């Protein structure tokens, strides 16, 4: 399962960029198998895999027709939304267990 593989690789430091005013994304060097089964409502804090090498962290709620593989969710959504939307475009996120 993709989420399990992602967890096995933690901690993981990813340099991310802004996209569409609702997400931060970063490319990982070691690919993760995807099932690309999730599309629809994206929630604040959703952590997704796009393709097999793009980690996406969403900080705004919206609907998408694109398919993602769900990896997890940030627990402190309110704090995330406030801090990450104001963050510099060249940001590094460290994911830990």
Predicted regions and their residues:
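Glycine-rich active-site loops that engage anionic ligands at enzyme catalytic sites
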Residues: 14-97
